[in-house]
Amino acid sequence: MLQPKRTKYRRTHRLQHDKGEAHTGNKVSFGKFGLQAKTSAWITARQIESARIAITRYMGREGQVFIRIFPQLSLTSKPIGVRMGKGKGSPEKWVAVAKVNTMLFEVSGVKDEVAKEALRLGSYKLPVKSKIVLKESE
């Protein structure tokens, strides 16, 4: 699963994910088709990995998948039954902040129907509403 190799601080602030749109990382850059978020949410490393597996299994051994988001925020929690205070909890999982219009995955090297179906299957594993977009021709 994805997580940072090292960070300056183990515990991070909880960033807001429901404000505004993504102005960078919102276009198809590497592949031909992309999966674009239409709502905002935190996406965990497990959800990213689950979507990646769903996409690659449908595509078989051909084509290439690009993951455009990375879980760099740590979410902390305290054990059940522990009283308030005594510091912040330990990091439990890593999440990526996906704003509206963030490009989540990209696919290239397969037929158009295969790419669309693979991204559709991958979108079911994610907690955001999404749409499949085609690369804009320059």
Swiss-Prot record:
Q: Which Pfam families match?
A: Ribosomal_L16
Q: Does the keyword RNA-binding apply?
A: yes
Q: Could you tell me which InterPro entries the record lists for this protein?
A: Ribosomal_uL16 (IPR047873), Ribosomal_uL16_bact-type (IPR000114), Ribosomal_uL16_CS (IPR020798), Ribosomal_uL16_dom (IPR016180), Ribosomal_uL16_sf (IPR036920)
Q: Which residues cross the membrane?
A: none
PANTHER family of this UniProt entry?
50S/60S RIBOSOMAL PROTEIN L16, LARGE RIBOSOMAL SUBUNIT PROTEIN UL16M
Subunit-structure text: Part of the 50S ribosomal subunit.
Question: What Gene Ontology molecular-function terms does this entry list?
Answer: rRNA binding; structural constituent of ribosome; tRNA binding
| Amino acid composition bias (Basic residues), ranges on this chain | 1-14
Where are the compositionally biased (Basic and acidic residues) regions? 15-24
State the GO CC annotations. cytosolic large ribosomal subunit
Protein name, per record: Large ribosomal subunit protein uL16
> What the protein does?
Binds 23S rRNA and is also seen to make contacts with the A and possibly P site tRNAs.
Q: Which controlled-vocabulary keywords does the entry list? A: Ribonucleoprotein, Ribosomal protein, RNA-binding, rRNA-binding, tRNA-binding
The organism encoding this protein is Mycoplasma mobile (strain ATCC 43663 / 163K / NCTC 11711)
